[in-house]
Regions:
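Signature of N-terminal electron-transfer/Fe-S-associated modules in redox systems
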Residues: 1-155, 163, 291
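Short coil/turn connectors at secondary-structure junctions
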Residues: 14-17, 30, 65-68, 172-173, ...
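Short, glycine-/Ser/Thr-/acidic-enriched flexible segments
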Residues: 34-35, 76, 184, 206-207, ...
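Short, hinge-like loop/turn segments at secondary-structure boundaries
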Residues: 66, 217-221, 262
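FAD-binding core/adjacent interface of flavoenzyme oxidoreductases
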Residues: 55-60, 97, 103-179, 226-301
C-alpha cells in the first residue's frame, strides 16, 4: 500500500490503518483516505466501466465532480441490501473500517466484462439505434427487446430492502451564508463575522481549506497554508461562525432559499443508532434565514 504513496503528503493518518473490501477483495487504507485514494494507493486504477461501450474507467478527479469512479457501498454484506447505496463517488466516500464496496456496470467481473463487446461493435450502436433497430417482429418487443434494453440501462443497481437509516431536516437562520471554505471563503467568513453578522460557512469536504489542503507549499501571510488554515479556524470559532463540513449546497431557490445536505454518519465506523444519517436544511438567505444540510462543493459567495 505504501509504495504508491508520497510520504509526508496528504491529509491521512499513517498510524490508523483501515480495512475495506472492493469487489470481494480486502484492501488496507488509512484514516482520511477516500475509497479512490485508497484503491490508488493499492495500485488499483480500474474502478468502473463506461455506460454504453463498457470501456475501462478510473478516477480522473478528486471530488464530487468525478464522472467515472461510481461504486456501490454498504455497511454490511452487499447482498443484505438495506444499507446498500449505488452510484457513490469513490472520490467522495471516506474510508471507514469494514466498508464494503463494489464496482458497477460489469459482468461477470470488472476485469473481464462481457459488455465490452459493445466497444468492438461500436459501428452498430450509433446514437438512438434502438429506436430504429428493434422493429420486427413486433411480438418480440415486450418479451425480448424491451427486457434486454432495460437490463442494459443505468449503472448501479437499486437497493432491494427498505433503508434502515433515518434522516433529519430543519430550517437554519443566518445573515450570511458562504458556500466553499477555500482561502477566499474563509477570509469572507471572518470579515463578515467581524462586522457583527451571523455567519454560516459550509464546505463539502471533511476539512475546510479547499485547494490549500493539497498544496502545503503555498504561504499566506508568511505562514504555511496548513498552519494558516488552523489559525483561521480558531478565529472563526472564536467569532461564533457556524462551520459545516461534509455539506453540499444543492439548490438556490425563490426568496433566497438555499438547500443544503450534510452527511453525518457516512464516514463513521459505527454510527450511533440515534444519529440521523443526513440532515437537510432549507431557508431564505440574506433575510436572516438560510438552508443547511449533506456533502458540499466550493463556490464562494
Amino acid at each position: 500500500m505504501s509504495r504508491y504513496r508520497i510520504m509526508g503528503k496528504g491529509r491521512v493518518d499513517h498510524s490508523a490503518p483501515v480495512s475495506f473490501t472492493f469487489d470481494g477483495k480486502t484492501y488496507q487504507g488509512l484514516r482520511g483516505d477516500t475509497v479512490a485514494s485508497a484503491l490508488l494507493a493499492n495500485g488499483v486504477h480500474l474502478m468502473g466501466r463506461s455506460f454504453k461501450y463498457h470501456r475501462p474507467r478510473g478516477a480522473v478527479t478528486a471530488g464530487s465532480e468525478e464522472p467515472n469512479a461510481l461504486i456501490g457501498t454498504s455497511r454490511g454484506p452487499i447482498a443484505s441490501g438495506g444499507r446498500f447505496e449505488p452510484n457513490t463517488r469513490a472520490t467522495v466516500q471516506e474510508l471507514r473500517d469494514g466498508l464494503v464496496t463494489e464496482s458497477q456496470n460489469k459482468w461477470p467481473n470488472l476485469a473481464f466484462d462481457l459488455g465490452a463487446v459493445n466497444d468492438r461493435a461500436y459501428m452498430l450502436f450509433s446514437a438512438g439505434f434502438y429506436y430504429k433497430t428493434f422493429m420486427w417482429p413486433k411480438s418480440f418487443w415486450d418479451k425480448v427487446y424491451e427486457p434486454v434494453i432495460r437490463g442494459a440501462a443505468g449503472l448501479g443497481r437499486s437497493p432491494t430492502e427498505p433503508d434502515p437509516d433515518h434522516y433529519a431536516s430543519r430550517y437554519l437562520h443566518t445573515d450570511v451564508l458562504i458556500i466553499g471554505a477555500g482561502a477566499a471563503g474563509i477570509a469572507a467568513a471572518l470579515a463578515a463575522a467581524q462586522s457583527g453578522a451571523d455567519v454560516t460557512l459550509v464546505d463539502e469536504n471533511p476539512e475546510m481549506g479547499g485547494s490549500l489542503l493539497s498544496d502545503p507549499a503555498v504561504q499566506i501571510d508568511g505562514q504555511p497554508a496548513w498552519d494558516w488554515i488552523e489559525a483561521q479556524m480558531r478565529r472563526l470559532r472564536a467569532a461564533g461562525v457556524r462551520l459545516m463540513t461534509r455539506t453540499t449546497a444543492i439548490g438556490y431557490y425563490h426568496q433566497n432559499m438555499v438547500g443544503l445536505c450534510q452527511r453525518l454518519t457516512d464516514h463513521l465506523d459505527t454510527p450511533p443508532r440515534q444519529c440521523p444519517a443526513r440532515t437537510d436544511v432549507a431557508g431564505p438567505r440574506g433575510t436572516g434565514r438560510a438552508g443547511a444540510g449533506c456533502a458540499g462543493k466550493a463556490a464562494g459567495l
